[in-house]
A protein has these predicted regions:
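Short, structural beta-strand-to-alpha-helix junction motif
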Residues: 1-4, 40
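N-terminal acidic leader/helix
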Residues: 3-23
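Detector for the mature cores of small, proteolytically processed
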Residues: 16-69
Length: 69
């Protein structure tokens, strides 16, 4: 299973309240995943990915942290 597939799978689980929004450098939304999924993302993607902006946005009244990759 690819990372993208894993992200999609977790994203569809509605029980989470805090999410990570992953964007590319063009500010396009790539994925939205639960905060609890953060460690798997850090383990699997480049270390540059960890230059993680703690930008807080609102996504359907939920807290969203933004990563730019």
């Amino acid at each position: 299973m690819t990372i993208r597939e894993k992200l999609q799978t977790v994203k569809t689980n509605k029980k989470y309240r805090t999410f990570i929004l992953i964007k590319n450098k063009n500010n396009e939304k790539l994925e939205l995943v639960p905060l609890t999924f953060q460690s798997m993302i850090k383990d699997k993607l480049d270390q540059e990915f960890i230059s993680f902006k703690k930008e807080i946005e609102h996504y359907t009244k939920e807290t969203v942290l933004t990563f730019v990759i």
